[in-house]
Amino acid sequence: MVGFMIALSVSSGYLLDNNYSEYSYYILDNDEDFLVFVICDEPNTLKCGFRISEIFSRVFCNAVYNNRYITNLKNLIEVGIYEALENMDKFLKQKGLDYNDLNVSIAGGVYRNGKLMLFSLGNSPVFVVDKDYYLYCPFDLNKNYNLKDWKKFIKFSEVIENPKSVVACSNKLDGKVFKFKNENNKLIAEPFKYRIIQLINSIISNRENIDKIKEELKTDLNLKDNTPLFVASFDEKPINDELVKVGKPKLKVRGCTPILSKKKEETSPHIEPKIIKNMVLAFILILILIFGLFVMLSHNNLNGGNNSDIVNNSSYQVNTSKISIITVNNENKSTNISLNPIQTVKTVSSLNNLDLNNTITKSKNKDSLKILVKFQVGEISKDIKKLPISIMFPEQGYYYISIKSENSNLKLIDVENGEVVYKNTTLIELFEKIDGKEKTYNLIVEYNGSEIPSEKGINISIFEIKIIK
């Protein structure tokens, strides 16, 4: 059965045709339900780097497509890589270049009849949304790799059955589409989940006008320096963001069927005593586990009361009318913040509602943790160039902070004392590791209008980030 597929390739480099640029190439065959794609991050600063990427991406995709009769997807990918590197090697010899001077990060995949396999050679991520709406990158990214010894460094995913969508992008989009943390090669995909889902849904909803979407993506993501991006959907319906779960699904343990001997008399006479001995040991182990569980539960019950006292007493430290109280529920720690009058709470169940057009509700969970946001300056005027903002966090961890201008006369310039991952005149985004309880940021602004309350000119969203390996 032939399925629905739509694909989009975007790069700030020169677009050779509708399917590929020098840095991104794909071949889509809806009649055969087949797709092959690859992205190549520009190799260092070589003058002919674009040509090297173009050779690899074009030859790889054509080789895979021409050999698509090979049923094993891993073998099919290896055929494409072998032919692509062979052509690249000829070009390098013509130019007198060496592999040691070249490290092009490569990522891609092959989809055929409902089955997808991804591969990675370097540190360019590939995200997949599987049939159960799990969003994850199958690989630990690695900056230490070598194309000449590619077999030692290449990584393949498991075969993914009936995926919803896939996104491959440059590692230069760190902080715009995903967050890459160098420690232990961990990818942080929350709260950047909404970015990835937006990319997918944008091509589904506008498949009749793909060229327009390409230009919008270039503007929205501020693509430059030959930054490749590939997006594909295997479903014609947009993905419901609320259904998407971040992280690789846990493997299910398959049950084993006991193998019985054909004849009872063939059973060894030593088996029965061994079985009895093992049953006794198992019974003793179960008793030990039950006793340990009882002790652990008793300990947690004793500590539970003390912890609740600490949480309930933490909100008295700040007393001002310019504070927004934001509840972070224990079940869902992804929360949008709106700077409304005190005692109003705004919560959402997904991360894609940055416009914050949600119903205002009051927290019903007495044990919920609170984030306190305070403007040190009550009014924004033409004389205000620096706006201090204090945030009290409920606990240590990683947080994503989005600061958005709500007034056309208010331009956002920068944020002092914060790790800025993206900024323009209307939006600044930060990725923060919080070790203490409170942190103050200086928001640098330019304002040309009449005085307005700070909470009406600026909208802030905060998400607690889960680190997904």
From Swiss-Prot:
This is Uncharacterized protein MJ0889. It comes from Methanocaldococcus jannaschii (strain ATCC 43067 / DSM 2661 / JAL-1 / JCM 10045 / NBRC 100440).
